[in-house]
Regions:
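Gly/Pro- and small hydrophobic-enriched strand-loop and loop-to-helix capping segments
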Residues: 125-147, 182-197, 255
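Glycine-rich beta-to-alpha active-site loop
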Residues: 99-143, 165-166, 170-171, 175
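Conserved CoA-thioester-binding segment of acyl-CoA-metabolizing enzymes
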Residues: 1-56, 97, 247
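Globin-like tetrapyrrole-binding proteins
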Residues: 196-198, 207-228
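Hydrophobic/aromatic residues within transmembrane alpha-helices
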Residues: 55, 68, 121-122, 177-178
Length: 255
């Protein structure tokens, strides 16, 4: 099974933990995985026992490397499913939209590779935690595609037109870059992830969205975070003055 769904009893209420579990493909999203995620979210949205949701990735290397391009390529090449690309992207975009609009607090915990469709999933989470080894990117331009999965919304919100920079270059951001531009809310050490889940399970969740969201917000602000001085230096910070000058030019050709 490439997506795992656990329903954990808390001190009061339940917590849904959704784990992308295909480490061999860096948890890349196949069409089947997208269908699984959507089914799980639909079930939890309508289950009064589930008060909060956590989304994470299995394995040591990635939260999610994006859509399973190999699956799409093979489907197109053999000609057996000409409708698959349209169906795949339609389902993926709908899933991303539903994460953004999920009626209960959603916490994303990302490590390692977070690219393309993985960033689409992560950006939809209400709260976004990253580990120091995280690498974020929207690399679609390198395969002749465009930044999708809601990127026209979340890239446009980045400061200094850095969303344009990410979209045009496919540049990779490290943990300090990610926090600097607001694509994540805070950092967490890998060894603290399980402790955080234990802490969440010890809470009293009410099933009232506003109250549970407030409780989760306060809890996250109480957890221990890495000393930010020990994190890798921001690549973007070194180049921001020059890049901003170019990114404000009126056309992409001039940029």
């Amino acid at each position: 099974m490439s997506v795992e769904a656990e329903e954990l009893a808390c001190r009061e209420g339940h917590m849904g933990v959704l784990t992308l579990n295909s480490p061999g493909t860096l948890n890349a999203l196949s069409e089947h995985m997208i269908e699984q995620i959507q089914d799980i979210l639909d079930r939890w949205a309508n289950d009064d026992r589930i008060c909060i949701v956590v989304i994470q990735g299995a394995g040591e290397r990635a939260f999610c490397a994006g859509g399973d391009i190999r699956e799409l390529y093979d489907a197109i090449l053999d000609g057996q499913e000409p409708e698959k690309p349209v169906r795949f992207f339609s389902r993926e975009y709908r899933m991303d939209y539903n994460i953004h609009r999920f009626p209960k607090p959603v916490l994303g915990i990302a490590h390692g590779v977070v690219m393309g469709g993985g960033l689409g999933v992560f950006s939809g989470c209400r709260y976004r935690l990253v580990t120091p080894d995280v690498t974020l990117a929207m690399p679609e331009i390198t395969i002749g595609l465009f930044p999708d999965v809601g990127a026209s919304w979340f890239l446009k919100r980045l400061p200094g037109r850095l969303g344009l920079f990410m979209g045009l270059t496919g540049a990779r951001l490290n943990v300090s870059d990610t926090l600097r531009v607001g694509l994540a809310d805070m950092a967490i050490l890998p060894e603290d992830r399980d402790r955080l889940l234990d802490r969440l399970a010890s809470e009293r969740w009410t099933g009232q969205t506003a109250a549970d969201d407030n409780r989760l917000f306060r809890l996250l602000n109480q957890i221990q975070t890495p000393d930010y001085r020990t994190l890798p230096p921001s690549h973007l910070a070194r180049h921001e003055p020059v890049s901003y000058t170019h990114l404000t030019l009126p056309t992409n050709r001039e940029v």
